[in-house]
From Swiss-Prot:
Its EC number is 4.1.1.39. GO terms for cellular component: chloroplast. Residues 1-2 form a propeptide. It catalyses: 2 (2R)-3-phosphoglycerate + 2 H(+) = D-ribulose 1,5-bisphosphate + CO2 + H2O; D-ribulose 1,5-bisphosphate + O2 = 2-phosphoglycolate + (2R)-3-phosphoglycerate + 2 H(+). Substrate binds at N123, T173, K177, R295, H327, S379. The gene is rbcL. This is Ribulose bisphosphate carboxylase large chain. The active site is at K175, H294. The modification N6-carboxylysine is found at K201. Heterohexadecamer of 8 large chains and 8 small chains; disulfide-linked. The disulfide link is formed within the large subunit homodimers.
Length: 453
């Protein structure tokens, strides 16, 4: 028996329930550079002090359980426990508060988003002492960031691969998303790419259904890519969705895409899971494939204001797990988001260092230590008349993705793609000439109509 164990065992063991705050509420604690920091929005049951509930969150997401156990004496709780180190009220919400929790780095497996989330959010959200709980933000320490590969390639490498600079990239989701045969699907891909788009996209629920098996879709889309490249002289791509029922099948589809010579594949990272996503990201880096990420199912997790997890946390997790693009909301269009809040997590995706800024929803300063950036994808419900606002809001390092805004053109798919490309280039040219896109956007688009269907 080690001296450490002998000493602790000699103190004795007293069973029973004790208040969490006696062990896990430590307002005097000074956070370490190696701690993972979390900001939780807590809505407690009536009559429970904030200190007790904040401590309960720290305990139940780290080393604690509902009672004292004798094996507590066999380890160092001071080394491994989570600590609620600060509590602040939520303006305008009398019953809510923000609990800040620090987790020692030793609690987490290196390079595993799966393990990080299992610890921090895996159990505590069902805690009956809380009416609701929402994870607003995480600070990932440099020491932990460096255990992740991150995106397969990143923004600059993608631009170099595509030879496209100085403007946002243009995409289109093929519609109807379900029911087309592989050949008709490939025809729509060709028409959009030939018209001037950089990418087309499988919808998130296009996998390998009876009406269109994945291998047939991959072959017809590859034919469309090569034909449009030959005719336009530009590099083109289609987000071939490799998401599958097993990791093995997913990798098999990615291997086939690589053998076809296409530049990019796609994954539904929340429904597919972080373990699968990280595996695919590693394969993509090793084999020169870009990786487009769809966030299908995100609203189940992030839509409720008081419960769940904010998308900025899912965005940080995606940058760690790996993806070159991720859908981020539009600020305009069918799925609007608060502008400042959206741009806050867009910066967390793209930039190397982001300062704390509560007005933009950024609770912690985040240093990514040169982890490659991720291109935000603005999509759903947008069209050419949104182009000035999108160009101004998202800047060059983004993907602007029009589904119905391309395929819904009265003259067909190719004219719809031409209209998008002309509108984008008109907005970029006007911006570079110093014109105000917010004030003159409508006029700029009307001028561009002279040269576009």
């Amino acid at each position: 028996m080690s001296p450490q164990t002998e000493t602790k065992a000699g103190v004795g063991f007293k069973a029973g329930v004790k208040e969490y705050k006696l062990t896990y509420y430590t307002p005097e604690y000074e956070t370490k550079d190696t701690d993972i920091l979390a900001a939780f929005r807590v809505t407690p049951q009536p009559g429970v002090p904030p200190e007790e509930r904040g401590a309960a969150v720290a305990a139940e997401s780290s080393t604690g359980t509902w009672t004292t156990v004798w094996t507590d004496g066999l380890t160092s709780l001071d080394r491994y426990k989570g600590r609620c180190y600060h509590i602040e009220p939520v303006p305008g919400e009398e019953e809510q508060f923000i609990a800040y929790v620090a987790y020692p780095l030793d609690l987490f497996e290196e390079g595993s988003v799966t393990n990080m989330f299992t610890s921090i959010v895996g159990n505590v959200f069902g805690f009956k002492a809380l009416r609701a709980l929402r994870l607003e933000d995480l600070r990932i320490p440099v020491a932990y960031v460096k255990t992740f590969q991150g995106p397969p390639h990143g923004i600059q490498v993608e631009r170099d691969k595509l030879n496209k600079y100085g403007r946002p990239l243009l995409g289109c989701t093929i519609k109807p998303k379900l029911g087309l045969s592989a050949k008709n699907y490939g025809r729509a891909v060709y028409e959009c790419l030939r018209g001037g788009l950089d990418f087309t996209k499988d919808d998130e629920n296009v996998n390998s259904q009876p009406f269109m098996r994945w291998r047939d879709r991959f072959l017809f889309c590859a034919e469309a890519i090569y034909k449009s490249q030959a005719e336009t002289g530009e590099i083109k791509g289609h987000y071939l969705n490799a998401t599958a029922g097993t990791c093995e099948e997913m990798i098999k589809r990615a291997v086939f895409a690589r053998e076809l010579g296409v530049p990019i594949v796609m994954h539904d990272y929340l429904t597919g899971g972080f373990t699968a996503n990280t595996s695919l990201s590693h394969y993509c880096r090793d084999n020169g494939l870009l990786l487009h990420i769809h966030r299908a199912m995100h609203a189940v997790i992030d839509r409720q204001k008081n419960h769940g997890m904010h998308f900025r946390v899912l965005a940080k997790a995606l940058r760690m797990s790996g993806g070159d693009h991720v859908h981020s909301g539009t600020v305009v269009g069918k799925l609007e988001g608060e502008r400042d809040i959206t741009l806050g997590f867009v910066d967390l995706l793209r930039d190397d260092y982001i300062e704390k800024d509560r007005s933009r929803g950024v609770y912690f300063t985040q240093d990514w230590v040169s982890l490659p950036g991720v291109l935000p994808v603005a999509s759903r419900g947008i069209h050419v008349w949104h182009m000035p606002a999108l160009t101004e809001i998202f800047g060059d390092d983004s993907v602007l993705q029009f589904g119905g805004g391309t395929l819904g053109h009265p003259w067909g798919n190719a004219p719809g793609a031409v209209a998008n490309r002309v509108a984008l280039e008109a907005c970029v040219k006007a911006r570079n000439e110093g014109r105000d896109l917010a004030a003159e956007g409508g006029e700029i688009i009307r001028e561009a109509c002279k040269w576009s269907p």
